[in-house]
Structure formats: C-alpha cells, structure tokens
C-alpha cells in the first residue's frame, strides 16, 4: 500500500497508467487498492478526478487489449501444451470456450469487479477469437465503470475522512 502511494506521489498519472496496464496483463498489482488511493488523492487535490478516471480507463483498456492479443495469438497453443498442468484439459477448455461464446461480452463487464476473473476473461476472449470490435466495446464499458466506481469510492472516503 505504501509503495503504491509513493509511486503515485512520485510519478502521478504515469504510475497510474503503467500499474493498470501491467496489473490487467497479470502482474500482482492491487488494482482496486491503487484506484481507491487515486480517488483519495483526487479529494486532496494531488490528482484531478476526471483526468484520473480517464488515465485509469485508458490504462485498463490497453491492458485488456494486450491480454486479448496475447490470448488470440499464443493462447490456444500455449493451453494445449501447458494447460494440463493447471487443470485446463481439452474438455474443460471446450466448456470455457462455449461459455465465453454465450456470455463472453457480459463477462468482460462483470469480470472487472471480480479479482482474478478480469485477468482471464481477456485471455479467453482472445483464445475464443471474440470479434475485436465487440471485445473493445464491452471491455471499454467495463473499464470505465470499474475505474469510475473505485476512484469515486476513494474520493468519497477522502470526503468522509476529513
């Protein structure tokens, strides 16, 4: 938590952007905590509220797009080769692909709010070759809502705390 605060204090919007891109791709970065801190900093006028939402949105969406592309280009061969080590055998992959075809776009929106799920929905969307325009549209809706909610929570905490 202190490291997140220090990075934001030292590098501002660049730190927010990079932490979200890398966190969405899969590095262990506490995204929700980070955005709540960002929201708090918007209350204390260290950061601008609207710009923080915009930068967070762009970082989250870029991270989702990178993950989608990795899933689309390398996902299926990687799963075929190494999936058995993490419980993703052919039968389970077929279930996942069927589920993603049916609920995939909506899982992108809901998945943002479930830690761990947002990280895999993007890869599985790419593996399942979801249409890129559909993917970007639903990922963008989810990214905006997710960033807005957590940054606003942090801002409200700042207002209540004072």
UniProtKB/Swiss-Prot annotation:
Main location: membrane
Keywords: Cell membrane, Membrane, Transmembrane, Transmembrane helix
Keyword Transmembrane helix annotated: yes
Keyword Cell membrane among UniProt keywords: yes
Subcellular locations according to the entry: Cell membrane
Origin: domain of life: Bacteria
Disulfide bond sites: none
Transmembrane segments: 7-27, 51-71, 134-154
Pfam short name (any one): VTT_dom
PANTHER family per the UniProt record, alphabetical: ALKALINE PHOSPHATASE LIKE PROTEIN
Family: Belongs to the DedA family.
Protein's recorded name: Uncharacterized membrane protein YbfM
Organism: Bacillus subtilis (strain 168)
Origin organism lineage: Bacteria, Bacillati, Bacillota, Bacilli, Bacillales
């Amino acid at each position: 938590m202190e490291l997140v605060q220090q990075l934001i204090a030292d590098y501002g919007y660049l730190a927010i952007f990079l932490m979200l891109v890398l966190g969405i791709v899969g590095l262990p970065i506490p995204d929700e905590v980070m955005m709540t801190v960002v929201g708090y900093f918007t209350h204390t006028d260290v950061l601008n509220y609207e710009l923080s939402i915009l930068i967070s949105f762009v970082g989250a969406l870029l991270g989702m797009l990178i993950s989608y592309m990795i899933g689309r280009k390398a996902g299926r061969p990687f799963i075929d080769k190494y999936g058995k080590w993490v419980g993703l055998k052919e039968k389970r992959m077929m279930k996942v692909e069927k589920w993603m075809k049916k609920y995939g776009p909506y899982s992108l929106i809901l998945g943002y709010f479930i830690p761990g799920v947002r990280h895999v929905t993007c890869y599985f969307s790419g593996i399942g070759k979801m249409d890129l325009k559909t993917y970007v549209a639903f990922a963008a809706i989810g990214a905006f809502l997710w960033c807005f909610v957590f940054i606003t929570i942090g801002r409200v905490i700042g207002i209540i705390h004072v």
